[in-house]
Amino acid sequence: MSETNPAATAPVSADAAPHRYTAAMAAEIEARWQDFWDAEGTYAAPNPKGDLAGDPELVAKPKKFIMDMFPYPSGAGLHVGHPLGYIATDVFARFQRMTGHNVLHTLGFDAFGLPAEQYAVQTGTHPRVSTEANMKNMQSQLRRLGLGHDRRRSFATIDPEYYKWTQWIFLQIFNSWYDDEAKKARPIAELVAQFASGEREVPGHAGRAWSSLSEAERADVLGEYRLAYASDAPVNWCPGLGTVLANEEVTADGRSERGNFPVFKSKLRQWNMRITAYADRLLDDLDQLDWPEAIKLQQRNWIGRSEGARVDFPVDGERITVFTTRPDTLFGATYMVLAPEHPLVEKFTPAVWPEGTRDAWTGGHATPTEAVAAYRAQAASKSDVERQAEAKDKTGVFIGAYATNPVNGEQVPVFVADYVLMGYGTGAIMAVPAHDSRDFEFARAFELPVRCVVEPTDGRGTDTSTWDEAFASYDAKIVNSSGTDVSLDGLGVVEAKERVTEWLERAGAGAGTVNFRLRDWLFSRQRYWGEPFPIVYDEDGIAHPLPDSMLPLELPEVEDYSPRTFDPDDADTKPETPLSRNEDWVHVTLDLGDGRGPRKYRRETNTMPNWAGSCWYELRYLDPHNGERLVDPEIEQYWMGPREGLPHGGVDLYVGGAEHAVLHLLYARFWSKVLFDLGHVSSAEPFHKLFNQGMIQAYVYRDSRGIAVPAAEVEERDGAYYYQGEKVSRLLGKMGKSLKNAVTPDEICAEYGADTLRLYEMAMGPLDVSRPWDTRAVVGQFRLLQRLWRNVVDEDTGELSVADVAESDIDAGTLRALHKAVDGVRQDLEGMRFNTAIAKVTELNNHLTKAGGPVPRSVAERLVLLVAPLAPHVAEELWRKLGHESSVVHEDFPVADPAYVVDETVTCVVQIKGKVKARLEVAPSISEDDLEKAALADEKVVAALGGAGIRKVIVRAPKLVNIVPA
């Protein structure tokens, strides 16, 4: 049986107890409670005003706005990998409701996109028809999972009522410019006023008054300032797709990310967003966001602003050039690191290790050549994101060469390490471990010098041997930075940078430089199924915005939905859009309300990219039925405004895939900042906390032709896999219909129930880690629910089986198990560690099962409340059986008694050179001195040391002692 074979079903024997928790019972319970929630509006989150206003007491509570990256309504529907993030946010939202929050959690659809257009091309069916059918199917699938969404707030980006405001936002951006002095967007009318008054000189028209310029000349001038502008510029033209592509949609080898067609540079007139104007703010404000470091890193690298200095480090008559943003710390550079791909690695790697090379630097290899080759092979298997992400263990090897620090003449060792990339800067860094966290960790791992050159302001002193982390503040004075030709001691960071950069330039050892990578966002697509631009052109080709009264500009009917595609290798072709074929729609006579009366115009026939609708959808969730304005300011302030810990405001939690790091997430941040500058919103950032869930993977089986075969029909024999008698290969990868390995949530819900599916997906592992699907393992969570049910309900009678026992009469072991579970589950749910929360619930449930006899009612009630966020249907049913009329959704989450939570002892691991040699049971409050004495006196430790001296003992009471022998 394959891992994706759903044949392993919930066990039901013929003589099963009549009131046992079964798949049939789960189906009945789940359907009934889902109907109840809908009828009662259980998940309705009240606004402070407007048509969705509600209970003032609930509005007065702390609020949480929890969002998923909304789905595209695919015709294939959902497989079990899709709901992973949706279930996780639902668990978290339920927990937040139970801890006293007004929780907004809903879900819409990102419904413009290429698949529906391709289906329309193939079948002639309008994209809206197929898309709405797909949405209906997915809504049914999602409802069956018991997701607690406020359905009043749902919408699709294809709704004219929605994309009216997408078009409106485009016009706000079109009618704005970025004031570099004010560091914000301003209405274009204010720029026109400056030109008209003479306050600002008209660029390109020296000496001419604004009033003397023709309309076309004025339009050209303003086009150089507008935040949305059309220009004739080199674009990425893909003849095979018949459309132009943004930089982000082109692979490193110059092909389309979708379809793998050749992409050529071609000069075309296209719409662009001047996102580069916001590069500094987009970069700087990342520091205020609670996002994964890997995502921040991708955005930082994509934006690519780097201001600092180029520094040359001599090596054997050659030089290694680095780019550093902290030239003021040059005296603190104690080693260098090259990216594994750096072209100088081979050149500088000698045949033998230099005399005195430490064993820890060699990676266990006999020669530098072997060490570097092995390390490069290891690094080649990692993505850039994996290489740069924060990690506890830093890896690398010494290449066997030393470079000269130009400011003090010191010889510093040169390493190769995967946390340095070739695609950024020069592919080489000067490492200043005292003032960079990654360099600090690397230096500690390889026992490299850590020299303080920026005086700490936190009282830790300059003796780095006592430091636990780097000191990276800019608000400090430079120390230990005096050489023969230049001294920085006593200077502030900014002044020190200027002085050392001047010295580098005088000495011919470097120069001040700026690095910047971000480009303006190409915003035109030659597609049908997208938002039309609210722009028309007059007979002179000048662009004019439609007035608000003409929004939404809806998509017209066309006979052919596809753009014209060409020979993929024909670079001399030009786009032909579907909208351009509807002559009656393209050529119109309109009165734009500008005092000129009716005039002939030509509509823009490109459409907006599929990213447009997702750039602002968090705002529509707040006030989804408002037809008069983008969002009511009071409602936006309530849910998304700046507050303590969130200086830029934004959604409290946003969960979705890491693949959107430099597309959707960057674009949405840009739009938010423009809307903030123009006073339409109070939140300058859309999403304060971002969490990237992992992927549920599945095995893909392929025959000798490389074609995927149905996973459910593959048989395993003697460690090999066969399909219809033919041996097939197996590889872990994505799950999907085309790979013939998809398992649908409908199948699992039918076999076990939605609560079991929810528990299994949450229990598979940490939420941010990818994990393989195994249908055979689902039954484990089903059995947990059966045991839970059995601890509360008599399977023979269906009556409660709990005991009404006073808290004081419950045995201490049960109380300790209960309160430790309550404490642990609360912490785990808050930290989104759902797999360990389920493990703690299981541990408590098992304790109660083994204890025998009826479970005390107060213990059973708290157990049900612990389960409620994870398995809400069975929790509701048990809560009702326990005599409660209210829904468990808004009950208070249990609170642990600290007296029962403290462990009497904890396990301390004793390591020698990083290897575990002993485990000690010690008091949680043991001092570091006493712990060190106990570790050194342990028989196993004494034997392992074998009489060797001790160079250092690292103690982290009460759980770790690390001994470094002499």
Curated annotation (Swiss-Prot):
Query: Motif ('KMSKS' region) spans which residues?
Result: 734-738
Record's Gene Ontology CC terms?
Answer: cytosol
Q: What class of enzyme is it?
A: ligase
CDD domains in UniProt: Anticodon_Ia_Leu_BEm
Reactions catalysed: tRNA(Leu) + L-leucine + ATP = L-leucyl-tRNA(Leu) + AMP + diphosphate
What broad class describes the main subcellular location of this protein?
cytoplasm
Return one GO MF term: ATP binding
From the Swiss-Prot or TrEMBL record, state where the protein is found: Cytoplasm
Q: One Pfam family of this protein, by short name?
A: Anticodon_1
The UniProt record lists the EC number as 6.1.1.4
| Locus of motif 'HIGH' region | 71-82
Entry superkingdom: Bacteria
At which positions is ATP bound? Answer: 737
GO terms in the biological process aspect are: leucyl-tRNA aminoacylation
Renumbered residue ranges of the record's region Disordered = 561-580
**Which residue stretches does the UniProt record annotate as biased composition, category Basic and acidic residues?**
571-580
Keyword vocabulary terms for this entry = Aminoacyl-tRNA synthetase, ATP-binding, Cytoplasm, Ligase, Nucleotide-binding, Protein biosynthesis
Q: Does the keyword Amino-acid biosynthesis apply?
A: no
Recorded hits in NCBIfam families, A to Z, give:
leuS_bact
Which family is it part of? Belongs to the class-I aminoacyl-tRNA synthetase family.
- State the name under which the record lists this protein: Leucine--tRNA ligase
Q: Which organism is it from?
A: Streptomyces coelicolor (strain ATCC BAA-471 / A3(2) / M145)
